[in-house]
């Protein structure tokens, strides 16, 4: 099986559909179909900050329900899930845009989209081990010796990265460069931390190229070990791209 992984769409529905088509898929009845039988994998953070989070949810969740795509959650997915469940969360850092989109829907539409997303989140794996263990898709990455583990510590790492506990002046967390020490045999494909170009280190690649911050949306083709990108239509924000 061959896969195309996309991460950190963040409500950029138009760029997502453009990238899916550039990767060679046609969308039939809401489902992406590739003539070579390739499968799309979404690596989390479908929503927040961008203009069309609801459309992204409908597309990914709809295709997932039909068994046509794979999906693993990101930290923004986790927060949206808790928000929809009625748990106390701070509606900020992008969640406010998705919440505003939901409020514009009719009561029935809001209920339908909320239930669709919650089902997606509840039925998805924390991370995906594919191609006989040669490929791992995890939103913020995973250490080699944690592959196959599902403890709370591993969950926190997969969703939030290798955080130090310290923050930048604007409040964003400072993270360790776990990829530099990665020594596993499997390819780990992840996102979470925006980079201007896909960052390949050892057998890891960060494909969050900051579409929602005006850069580009990137897909990773496996087993080809190639990337394909489309430009963002949003304003470029240099401040969102930091050294690892």
UniProtKB/Swiss-Prot annotation:
Free-text comment on the cofactor: Nickel. 100-fold less efficiency with manganese.
Entry GO CC: cytoplasm; intracellular immature spore
Catalyses which reaction(s): P(1),P(4)-bis(5'-guanosyl) tetraphosphate + H2O = GMP + GTP + 2 H(+)
Entry cofactors: Ni(2+)
Membrane-spanning parts: none
Keyword annotations of the record: Germination, GTP-binding, Hydrolase, Nickel, Nucleotide-binding
Stated regulation of activity: Inhibited by EDTA.
Protein name, entry field: Bis(5'-nucleosyl)-tetraphosphatase PrpE [asymmetrical]
Uppermost EC category: hydrolase
Protein EC: 3.6.1.17
HAMAP family in the cross-refs: PrpE (MF_01443)
Pfam families for this protein: Metallophos
A GO molecular function held by the record: bis(5'-nucleosyl)-tetraphosphatase (asymmetrical) activity
Primary localisation category: other
InterPro entries, per database record: Ap4A_hydrolase, Bis(5'-nucleosyl)-tetraP_PrpE, Calcineurin-like_PHP_ApaH, Metallo-depent_PP-like, MPP_PrpE-like
Subcellular location: Forespore
Disulphide connectivity of cysteines: none
Family under the similarity heading: Belongs to the PrpE family.
Described purpose of this protein according to its UniProt entry: Asymmetrically hydrolyzes Ap4p to yield AMP and ATP. Does not hydrolyze Ap2a or Ap6A. Also has an ATPase activity. Was shown to dephosphorylate phosphotyrosine but not phosphoserine or phosphothreonine from phosphorylated peptides. Involved in spore germination by controlling expression of genes coding for GerA and GerK receptors.
PANTHER family with a match to the protein in the record: BIS(5'-NUCLEOSYL)-TETRAPHOSPHATASE PRPE [ASYMMETRICAL] (PTHR42850:SF7), METALLOPHOSPHOESTERASE (PTHR42850)
Species assigned in the record: Bacillus subtilis (strain 168)
Gene expressing this chain: prpE
């Amino acid at each position: 099986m061959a896969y195309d992984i996309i991460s950190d769409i963040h409500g950029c529905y138009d760029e997502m559909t453009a990238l899916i088509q550039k990767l060679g898929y046609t969308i039939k009845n809401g489902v992406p179909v590739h003539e070579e039988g390739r499968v799309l994998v979404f690596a989390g953070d479908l929503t927040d900050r961008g203009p069309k989070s609801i459309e992204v949810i409908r597309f990914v969740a709809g295709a997932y329900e039909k068994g046509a795509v794979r999906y693993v959650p990101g930290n923004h997915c986790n927060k949206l899930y808790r928000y929809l469940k009625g748990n106390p969360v701070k509606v900020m850092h992008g969640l406010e845009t998705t919440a505003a989109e939901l409020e514009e829907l009719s009561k029935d539409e809001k209920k339908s989209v909320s239930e669709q997303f919650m089902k997606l989140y509840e039925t998805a794996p924390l991370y995906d081990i594919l191609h006989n263990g040669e490929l791992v898709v995890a939103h913020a990455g995973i250490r080699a010796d944690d592959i196959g583990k599902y403890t709370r510590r591993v969950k926190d790492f997969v969703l939030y990265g290798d955080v130090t506990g310290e923050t930048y002046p604007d409040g964003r967390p400072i993270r360790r460069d776990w990829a530099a020490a990665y020594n596993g045999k499997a390819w780990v494909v992840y996102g979470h931390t925006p980079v201007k170009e896909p960052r390949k280190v050892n057998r890891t690649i960060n494909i969050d190229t900051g579409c929602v911050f005006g850069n580009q949306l990137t897909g990773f083709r496996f087993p080809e070990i190639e990337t394909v990108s489309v430009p963002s239509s949003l304003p470029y924000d240099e401040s969102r791209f930091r050294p690892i």
